[in-house]
Amino acid sequence: MPDDFKIPRATLKRLPLYYRFVSILKGKGIDRVNSKTISEALQIDSATIRRDFSYFGELGKKGYGYNIDSMLEFFKSELSESDQIKIAIIGIGNLGRALLTYNFSIHDEMTITEAFDIRPDIIGENIGDVVVKHSDDIKTTLESEDIDVVILTTPDNVAQQVADELVKAGVKGILNFTPRRIKTPQDVQVHHIDFGIELQSLLFFMKNYSK
């Protein structure tokens, strides 16, 4: 595969699903898995899985299945260059508090280590072993802690302003839970999470594809 080859974006979006499933299999002591098993578990067409995995190199052989350890090693290298991903969250309202309390409890490699808000009554509060700091400290903290991934759960009217500050602080990835479609430079990746759209999509598939 050429050095400048890039895995398609659609395939990249499925990587975390594959990674989670394969990690579960590893925990059960399973050392190989075939595309049919993955397809049934994740509800992804087998042909799509085989095409996705064709981009990943020699992870298995036809009729023999994919090697779990090789898959885990590949997924880790693609999802992160380090074993531990430090994440910051900005906006500790109801959703922010819930995410901070959950704090990726089933993902050992990802941890929210910094939290920010502007409300005086919440600054200094310890939530899930993370102390909430004032938003004025965002740039200094992110730079000193080398954090380049942020979860954004602020009110939508300040989302773009906060995003601009994050870009200045060197952030390269934003998971945006606000309704605002924020704009960033091309080298900053933004994934928008809209619960309303996700529910509409779910209802559509229930209506049109349920047996």
From Swiss-Prot:
- The main place the protein resides is cytoplasm
Name the GO terms of the biological process aspect: negative regulation of DNA-templated transcription; response to redox state
Q: Which domain of life is it from?
A: Bacteria
Residues involved in NAD(+) binding: 91-96
Q: Where in the cell is it found?
A: Cytoplasm
Q: Which residues bind DNA?
A: 17-56
- Output one GO MF annotation: DNA binding
Q: Enumerate the UniProt keywords alphabetically.
A: Cytoplasm, DNA-binding, NAD, Repressor, Transcription, Transcription regulation
What SMART domains does the record point to? CoA_binding
Q: Which Pfam families match?
A: CoA_binding, Put_DNA-bind_N
Q: Give the record's GO CC terms.
A: cytoplasm
How does this polypeptide assemble, per the annotation?
Answer: Homodimer.
Identify its protein family: Belongs to the transcriptional regulatory Rex family.
* PANTHER family (UniProt xref): REDOX-SENSING TRANSCRIPTIONAL REPRESSOR REX, REDOX-SENSING TRANSCRIPTIONAL REPRESSOR REX 1
Write down the HAMAP family for this protein, in alphabetical order: Rex
Q: Function, please?
A: Modulates transcription in response to changes in cellular NADH/NAD(+) redox state.
Kindly provide the name given to this protein in its UniProt entry.
Redox-sensing transcriptional repressor Rex
> Lineage of the source organism?
Bacteria, Bacillati, Bacillota, Bacilli, Bacillales
GN (gene name)? rex
